[in-house]
Every structure is written in C-alpha cells, then in structure tokens.
Amino acid sequence: MTEIRFDALCIGNAICDVFAHVEEDFLLQEGLVKGSMRLIETDEAVALFNKMGQTVRISGGSAGNTAAGIASLGGRPAYFGKVAEDELGDSYYHDMNGTGVYYNTPRLREWKPTARSMILITPDGERTMNTYLGACTEFSPSDVDEDVVAAAAVTYMEGYLWDPEEAKKAFLAAAEIAHKHDRKVAITLSDSFCVDRYRDEFTGLLSDGVVDLMFANEHEIKALYQTGVLDTAISAARESGAMTALTLGKEGAMIITPEETVKVPAQQVDNVVDLTGAGDLFAAGFLFGLARDYSLTNAAELGCICASSVIKHVGARPERPLKNLAAQNGFEV
C-alpha cells in the first residue's frame, strides 16, 4: 500500500483574491454598484484588472484556504486546482508552495486567464467584488494525479466542483482512486445555493458511500435536507451513513455519525472582523486532527480554534502560525 505522505489533499477552484483601494468615482466610471458581488466574463475581467492600479494579491479559494490552514498547523497538505500560465497564475503557484502546500497541477496554456476575485475597497471600507472564474473551471480528470491521491489520508473537495461537467468527473475520479487505496473522501457543501443546484446528487454521494465525511454549516445542511428545523437536518445527516462536521457559528460545532454526536463550543471572540474563512479553517483543524488520530472531540476543538483565529482579521488565510496557537491550547502538533 502507498505510504501516507499528506494529511489531506484539498481540491477546488483556484481563485486569486486581488484587493485595491479605489475612490467612489472609480466605481461610477466603471458602472459598478458599491457593495455588490457579481460574476464577469473574460474581456471585462482583463480590462478591470488592468485599471486597478496598486493591488494586494492573496491566493484564495475555499479548498486552497483549507490546505493553507493545514500547512500553518505544521501539517502536510496537497492541493489540486487549475490556474493559467499568466501573472496571477505565477503568484498563485508561488504563494501556495511558499506556505508549505504541495501544489503541482498542470497549468492552462491557452484562452482563459487565472480566476480572480477583484475586490475594490472604497474609503468607507465597503467592498465591491467582481469575480471571474476563468481557468479554474477547466479542472478535469487529467489533472488528478493518482500518486498524490493515494498518498493522502483524506481527499477533501469543494461542492463547487459539481458546476463544470469535467470538474464533476474529476471529483468522482479522485473519490474512486482514494477508496481504491483505502483512503477517505470528504466534501464541503460550499454554499446553500450550490446545495439547491445539486441536492439529489449530493445526498446520493452520501448514501452511495462515495463520500465518507461531509462539512456543512447550518444553512447548507438545512438546504440539503429541505427543512427549516436544525434537529430534523441533524437526524437526516445521522441516517446518511456518513460523518458530518457541522459548524454552527457562535454555537460551536457538532460532529454527527451514525453511532454518536459530539458537540464542542466555539472559542470566544470579542471582535469579529471577517467571517469569510471560518468554515475553511475549521475544516483545516478538523482534518489535521483526524490525520493524527485525535478523538472527534479534540479534532473539532482544534477546528474551532483555527476558525476563531481567522475571523479576527481580514482575509481567509492565517496571519500567524496556527501551530503556535494550537500548542498554546494544549495540542501536540
């Protein structure tokens, strides 16, 4: 059997977050509605990017954030995600590998630039987001490296991969390889709208044993089981046969299996700045804990510690090593 070399392989949309401070007039000139979030096409994405002036670039994407979190804990993550052979693709590659993530997905050589979320910040702090998916939607089964999947304790994938047909095929191919090598497969539901699009297919992944572990928040799990009652959704998750890691914001987290339910409290945070990466970093802590044979309680506690750290600042990546924070809270990392 292949030796486990990675705590987790994270697979998802490789998106570069590009931040720029702009004046109100800039939004007016570009016909943008302040505070809005929208998807844009290639020509507009390139034109807007070229007008942004001085920018700060941070590699993003949900699964990428989780991989970076595992690395920050001192773990060994790998990542699959598609970028182009362009300036932002260079930044993404450098950034991911620089944080300690093994990342070597072949780059797209033609026609679609690297995905980017261009975030324009006006003097009042309001964010106007313009997202171009570009190259990340071209992830396909040919990008799934069997040796890496076989060497990962768990393969963790975004629900967003279900949108492009080739990415869906890649998801299923990676899951099949993982199980062939007696590894685990996890999905994060991504958002409630994604759940609404693919509800039957996602529940099928659970009931058919394609997915062993599901990550969801309260909105997503209610959407999955079409109920407004959390306890009803929890009961349905318990009957799915898979493990569910459920984040509940200020109420902490719950781990649900057919045999047991574990509840852990959230860490106290007095000044919440940005909730963007909370779920991604919870997953990082939990997956890290599972790879090191922590109890479900301890793995969930570490997940909550990681989530509490990232919501204290802007952005979805750790600002300080999570390894130190975990050690301060009594974890051996």
What is each PLM-predicted segment?
Residues N104-L108, I119-E165:
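Conserved phosphate-binding/catalytic loop of the ribokinase/pfkB sugar-kinase fold
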Residues D95-K112:
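A glycine-rich helix N-cap at a beta->alpha junction
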Residues E3, V148-A151, L206-D208, R238:
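A short, aliphatic-rich alpha-helical micro-motif
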Residues A67-R76, L120-T122, G289-R292:
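Alpha-helix C-terminal capping segments
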Residues M1-F80, E87-S91:
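Glycine-rich phosphate/adenosyl-contacting loop at the front of the ribokinase-like
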Residues M1-L9, A14, L28-K34, I177-K180, ...:
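Conserved phosphate-binding/catalytic region of the ribokinase-like
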Residues V154-S235, A242, E251-A253:
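Conserved beta-alpha-beta core of the PfkB/ribokinase-like small-molecule kinase fold
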Residues P77, Y103, V185-A186, T244:
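Hydrophobic beta-strand scaffold residues
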